Swiss-Prot record:
Xref: InterPro entries: aa-tRNA-synt_IIb (IPR002314), aa-tRNA-synth_II (IPR006195), aa-tRNA-synth_II/BPL/LPL (IPR045864), Ser-tRNA-ligase_type_1 (IPR002317), Ser-tRNA-synth_1_N (IPR015866), SerRS_1_N_sf (IPR042103), SerRS_core (IPR033729), tRNA-bd_arm (IPR010978)
Gene name per UniProt: serS
Domain notes: Consists of two distinct domains, a catalytic core and a N-terminal extension that is involved in tRNA binding.
Protein family: Belongs to the class-II aminoacyl-tRNA synthetase family. Type-1 seryl-tRNA synthetase subfamily.
Name of the protein: Serine--tRNA ligase
Species of origin: Aliivibrio fischeri (strain MJ11) (Vibrio fischeri)
Amino acid sequence: MLDSKLLRTELDETAEKLARRGFKLDVETLRNLEEQRKSLQVKTEELQAQRNSRSKSIGQAKAKGDHEEADRIMADVANLGSELDEAKAALAELQQQIEDIALSVPNIPDDSVPLGKDENENVEVLRWGTPLAYDFEVKDHVDLGEMADGLDFASAVKISGSRFIVMKGQFARLHRALSQFMLDLHTEEHGYTEMYVPYLVNPDSLFGTGQLPKFGEDLFHTSPLTEQVSDVPLKKLSLIPTAEVPVTNMVRDTITDEADMPLKMTAHTPCFRSEAGSYGRDTRGLIRMHQFDKVELVQITRPEDSMAALEELTGHAEKVLQLLELPYRKVVLCTGDMGFGSRKTYDLEVWVPAQETYREISSCSNMWDFQARRMQARFRRKGEKKPELVHTLNGSGLAVGRTMVAILENFQQADGKIAIPQVLRKYMNGVEFIG
């Protein structure tokens, strides 16, 4: 969430910056609530001071033996206490209203982010590799996978429903090989620490990274199937939409030493998304699934280092595509296409031959102090007593299923077989072709 000071002392300027991303901040409501809050804050402090002053008089009256006066003062103190409780309750309600509004406000775009309404106004900054020209009819990954009996959508529908997949044999092995290759690259060459994390998380974790309260419908939530058998309250958990959630929450409510920064963590996990707003989109194939695997990259940095870290992290995701020899382009998202908590985002889009277009395969974002403020994730500089908020960054390095799509389609042969990229062959026991 944004610094509350921005909504108090720089309200108009903040509204202008948010308008760049198409968000209309309710300035008048916030201004009125803030005026009421200030008034109630003053009233509360005055009542507190009056009650404290009158309370001291009780002992003085008793010391003089004037018990009648002491009783009158005690009655006054009780009345002041009731007024104070009412004022505190009203103040808490006002503060909650202000916080509810603040939680619905997205991050402020960085000045370097291009102005735009939607994905059509994103700006391409780099293109790597050249799409192949095929002398045969290109098949999509669904046809290629079903021809080889490696992708079984029918069984997945029977087991779970639409937007799920069963992979078999060498296709399942290729999926595993991709995950292993990505993890090895990021841990051995890029300096990340591998993490194994829970796939079920509590509401506090989802609040910390910004999925709650605004995006609850995009998640899969669990409900206990059995009756409560102890005094421990049953907690509602949710399946992770991305490893960003558990990995970033590692620093929630902690203070990190400056000497230990940056923290660089990676995790391979399944991800679960309801795709509530994607009805009718990408209904064929592996592009948009309820369950998919992803290797996530997370960095925790000092504020002054985060923009350079975004370039580095994005470069780490790009390296995966380059080693796999997959043509891609890099775009910076415009203000109207940015994620809720992002300050600046790069998307990497891989070439998909059957669609004759580039499709997103990684999104790398600098969240600034937006998540850190929610999580109270801080660090302490050497020689300083007061801790500061960290900056958090995350990105896909990469989405495994979409990387499968790209390999199947870009490396297809005229006979329907798939050539295995050179860097993956050691993970495939030397196999050069599948299908």
